[in-house]
Every structure is written in C-alpha cells, then in structure tokens.
C-alpha cells in the first residue's frame, strides 16, 4: 500500500510545498466564505498556496490553478456521555484535538467534546488519504502535512505588529477567591489604607483593601503598599479605582507581573458594592460613581438592556463577532450592506467577482467585500435552532437562550486595515473615520459601471464673502456626509445644566458624591441652524482688495445624494487634548427635509471677487541667488496637523498631507494619507519645491512660468480620487498654480474646454493611471444628474426629502473606548445589531445616536 500511495502522489509532488517562514496558512476560514473545519463540509487547505476553501469553492480553485492536493480538515462536536448521577463524565485530556481553533461557545466545554480529523484529498477524483500516515506517505508529504497542521494563525503576525500589545486573561480570573468580610467601597473619598495617598489607588479583588501603587521616577505614583500587601497575603489581582467604566477597567496581576483581563470583573466588583454600569473613568481618583440616584446609563438604553429582545434569523439578520474593539467595523458594514446598491455591487455580483478574483483572494478588496456581503445576506450563517434541539432543551429543563454565532470578520479586517496605524491595531476607533476609509477603498477598487459609493456623494456649494468689499466667491467641493454641530447653548434644559454644573463642582470640592447627571437635550432644528450659520474664514485673502481681509463662509447643497449620512459632532478634544464625548440627547426626526438648504448660486446684485491668484512671496536672497534655493516654509494649518497626529500618524506625514492638500482641512489630508501611506518616504520630512533662477517670475510679469510645469502627482491623485478625469485635473491644477481649492473651483466653472481637453487627453493616454475610480467615470449611468458633465463627480441629484432607516450609536466617553451598536429598519420593523446578536428592537434610542442614515423618499 505504501508503494501505491507513493506512486499515486508522484505526479503531484512538485506542487506540494512545506510552509516557509512568512507563508500564511489559512486553516480556519475559507477565502470565499465563512466555512471552517466546523462547517458541515469542513475546510480544504491547498498544499501549495495554503489557502483555505469550503466545499462549495474548492472546485473553483482547482479549475483555476490546477492544484490537485488539498488537506481536508473537519472538527466534530459530540455531546459527552453522562455518568450515573446524570452529570457529564469528567473531562480527560483529548488527544484527538489538534487544530488551532477557537472552541465554539455555543457548546459548553463541560458537556461537549471535540474530535478533529485530517486527510489528504486528491482532485478531481476526491481520492482520500487519512492522516497521520507516516509509514505510507513520502517523507516530504508527511513533513508538509505536519507543518500545515502546526502552522500558527495568519492573523497572529498582524496582531503582534499592532502598536498595542494584546492583554491576556489572567489565570486567576475564573477561580478568584473573594473574602466575605463585609467590605463595601464608597463612591468617593478613597485613600491608601497605609498612608495618605489619594492617587494611583488599587483595589485588591480578594479582600477589598485600597492601597497605593508603586513610585515612579518622576515623583508620581505611590509608596508601593499594594505590592507589599500582595507579598504578605498572596492575593493576586487588583483593579485601579479611577479606571472603572462600563467598558472595563485596568487590572494588574501581581503574580503574573503584567496587566491582565478579567472576564468576571463585573461580578468581582459587585462583591464590594461597585456597579460597573454606573461608573465613569476619572483622572484624579476622587470619585467614580456618576450619581447616587442611578440614572439609566447609555449602555442600558442603547443596547436595550433589561428587555427580552426576540432574536431573528435568516437573510440580512446575520451578526458579526467582535474581535476585540472591532464593533466600529461591524456596525458600519451592517448598515452598508442594508443598502441595495452595495448588495448589488458585491453580493449580487458574487460569482463574477469570485471567478475573476486573483490567485490570492484574501488580498483582494472586492472579493472580501463580496464574501462579507454574502455572509450577511445569504442567511447561511443565521439559522434558528432546530425544533428537535428546542424539545431536547425543554426535556432537560434548560431554558437558556440559543446563542447566535455570527460570522468572524478576521480576514476582512486584516485586509481593509492593512498598513493603517489605527485600524490595524486592537484599539477602539471612530466609526465615522472608518466609514470614510472604506468609501475610499470602494472607490479605489471600483472598476464596474456601478460604483456603490455614488449614493453618498454630493456637491457642497460654499459662498465666501469679503466683509470689506462685500464681493463674493462661489466654490464647490465633494462630500459624503453631513456633519452637524451640536450647540449645547441651545439646549432646551439649559437651566438644569447650569444648576447641575454648580452642584458638581461643589461636590468635587467637598469630596462628596456627585449629583445625578443631567444630559443636555438639544433640538435637531438647532443643529441645522448651526450648520447654516456663517463661519469666519481665517487668513482670508481678498482678490478685490489684493490683501488679507475678514471673510465669512456659508455652505449649501448643490446636489442632494440618494442616501444622506448625518453625523452629529459629539466628539471633541478637552483642554488636555484627550478626546471626549459630549453627553447629549438630540431629537433626530424620522423624516428630514433639506430642500431649503439647496444652493442658489450667484444672486442678482452680488458681485464676484476677481479671479486672481494670491502673489507668491519670494525672499530677496532667493532672487539674487544663481543656484537652486527653496521658497519660504509654506503656511501649514497646524490644527489639521495635530488632528491627524492624534490619530497616530507620523508628524511629518501629517504635515505633508496638509501641505499637498492645500490646507483644505483634516478630512482631505486624511484621504491623502490613506493613498500614500505605503510609500517609502511617507514619514520623511516635507521637501518644499525649489525653482531655478531662470524660472523665477519677474515682479512685473504674470507668474506663468511655474504654471507650465507638470502639477504634483499627489494633487492629481487627490482630484482623480474625487471622480474627475485625469486630463481635466491636470488642466485645472496648471490654471490655478497647483492650488487644490482653486483647482476644484476651476473644474466646476470650466466644464467645456474641448480643444484643451483633447490635447490633454492625448497626454494622459501616455501617462500611467492606475486610478480605477477615474476609469469608472467612462460609464454612463441613467441615475446620475441629467445635466451633469462627464468631467464632474458622479452624483445622484434629486429632492432633499429623506426617511431615517438606520443609525449607529456609541457608548462610552470617547472614540478611544466604548462600544458601538446599530439599529436598522427592515420590512417596517427596527432591529438592533449588537455584535453577533441580531434582535427585534423594542425601543430604538434614536435620540442617542452618533451617525444617522437617511434614504431619499421616492415621491416628494
């Protein structure tokens, strides 16, 4: 038989590889679906590429590549036999479990056991060879099989590269002993039991003692009494008192000598009278309890805690597992795939996308979007428990709710966050920033006639007026969402807020419990009014005066999108630059009419500002030099730089992003960063352009020589990413001296430049252009604005009346922590998507949302 197997494998030996360092082995998830070794058909791992495939997709890979040898992995879940007393037989070491897979939480480890099975399968005849089979298989095949079975998860490398080291669960957490000594921790007034320290205090989770932490070299910290107590008592776990929030707390294990996780921290704190849901992180340690008379917290209201929510199953009702601070991604994707255009673009084109996917589909954005869309919409991974299972539970007198499993977005997250310093980390992120990041990826990877992100795109008209000359300038820009300021001064309960603030300060000064928190109630109409108010333009250069002057700017909608995203600007920076969230309630309407905000363009009686370019200031020593010299350091909006740096990007990269986007704001600079972050000089210092003496303009002549130069590729990329053709962007940049803001204005005001466009088009044909989005503009779309020129961004203009169909809510004190859930209206009923759980919503908290999604009403 050994000879037979050896001869059988001879034709395939050149295709069987042993995984090398750097090879990623996907043995837990299919590249095209969410099938795993636990699925009915198991998982097939290619012995050449080490990609995993479910039973429905392995044939496609075989036909495309000709690879014939696969390792088939299958995990069987069996209920343990019961003992004489009715309980499960005690667990023994199971030698039949060898796959590095997470245990299915739906099956209690004490009542179920696992058995793993592996075998080689040769296509197309599906000839099977059970493993292990050392005696009969060639040595190379045996080594390759062992290497595949023992290979680590392909995501562990990425996780270890994250800025933030993953914190492990303490081995003491599950069996922690807590003394029943009657200790109750007060909400304020703590101090170390052995000294007078009131900062850096730690609560021992065994006996409830409050002691100070260790001393730091800068003089802060404490006297190390918490560590001394551990050495005397051997009580291992302690929690830092001023870090307790509904999201968790900072926990340290003296025994393991590192920060740890405690999955049972809520129960352990409740033993000493501390309710996590009523806690808020503080910096000074003087208090944590928000209020003595507990108000129902955001966590309970938004998650609809305490209500018996009915789980739902089937197509469109599949949850997404939380990978650890990945809820910002899950909620965003749930909402996007409730939109028909995204469903059609990816799930609707599933077979075409899969058939034309590259050899490594795990690195293809469209493939992974189609996979995620199918996983959420097919209903294949959201099936209700079988009647037999429910009957069995009743017979056993078990009434526990059946867990919804959901799908794991590991492969998708690894791809869309690749190279991004924030999204690739394990930290919580801003769902708004991730949405813009994803739209950027959708546009960069779109090559079809229908770009699903078109439904969000609209044009904003900005009217800037010189306060001295009263002349105006109208410009237009592209945007994808409406950011609404929330004016706290317009709160309907302003008197209550003022009274609360006084009581809070008094309580802090006297170290007394804080009063019940009062949440600001801001009318939505006040938010709209704040959006329409004129804003001052800093450093405004008036072409009428040819000097800097005071200027004001107002914004209106030149077009209305098919879907309007409204973001409430709840997050801000404190005086210490720590991001924080404003505690507010906004009465967001179910129906929204924005028609009164439609742009009107230049009005009768208004006079336009002259179309002049601000002068370029050149130092005298540069004029006299005969060698290359750089211009003065450019003006860079430092507030935008700091905003980007706070996201974790290198400072020099932030400066370049703001510079190359013409100081047009952090959002535009963020898009530049996403497009250039993989370049080798991404974090190198900004190099200001230089000019030869012969290129320097004479003071008495127009500055035309500089315009003859090719515009920077960065500026071209930014404009083409907005949907403008490359030749038109080059024209616009040359006409505006490479100023992005004026180039945008030029594009909108010069739609018909036929002769020059044709000339530029010939040039563009010879230049490399890998922007797939600009190629997509060659396709016509009947749903676009009828009078829209092909050189304009693709927008779907129409009436500005909308109906709310989804909203994303955030719980927590800042974007750096907390939790996201989303509510979506489907088939006339609201549902709540909370990680892997999908249930009918009883009380959708529309007033506490963060991002709201509206669809245009068909009849207006």
UniProtKB/Swiss-Prot annotation:
Domain USP: 318-857
SUPFAM superfamilies for the chain: Cysteine proteinases, RING/U-box, UBA-like
Enzyme class of the recorded protein, top EC level: hydrolase
Sequence ranges assigned to domain UBA in this UniProt record: 635-676, 710-750
Compositional bias (Polar residues): 769-780
SMART domains reported for this sequence: UBA, ZnF_UBP
A biological process term (GO) from this entry: proteolysis
Gene Ontology CC annotation, any one: cytosol
InterPro entries: Papain-like_cys_pep_sf, Peptidase_C19, Peptidase_C19_UCH, UBA, UBA-like_sf, Ubiquitinyl_hydrolase, UBP13_Znf-UBP_var, USP_CS
Region entry Disordered, spans: 611-636, 755-795
GO molecular function annotation: cysteine-type deubiquitinase activity; cysteine-type endopeptidase activity; ubiquitin binding; zinc ion binding
EC assignment: 3.4.19.12
Keywords carried by this UniProt record: Autophagy, Hydrolase, Metal-binding, Protease, Repeat, Thiol protease, Ubl conjugation pathway, Zinc, Zinc-finger
Activity regulation comment: Specifically inhibited by spautin-1 (specific and potent autophagy inhibitor-1), a derivative of MBCQ that binds to usp13 and inhibits deubiquitinase activity.
Chain segments annotated as transmembrane: none
Skewed-composition ranges (Acidic residues): 755-768
Ranges of Low complexity composition bias in the record: 781-793
Enzyme active site: 327, 819
Catalytic activity: Thiol-dependent hydrolysis of ester, thioester, amide, peptide and isopeptide bonds formed by the C-terminal Gly of ubiquitin (a 76-residue protein attached to proteins as an intracellular targeting signal)
Family, similarity comment: Belongs to the peptidase C19 family.
Described purpose of this protein according to its UniProt entry: Deubiquitinase that mediates deubiquitination of target proteins and is involved in various processes such as autophagy and endoplasmic reticulum-associated degradation (ERAD).
PANTHER family, per database record: UBIQUITIN CARBOXYL-TERMINAL HYDROLASE, UBIQUITIN CARBOXYL-TERMINAL HYDROLASE 13
Protein name: Ubiquitin carboxyl-terminal hydrolase 13
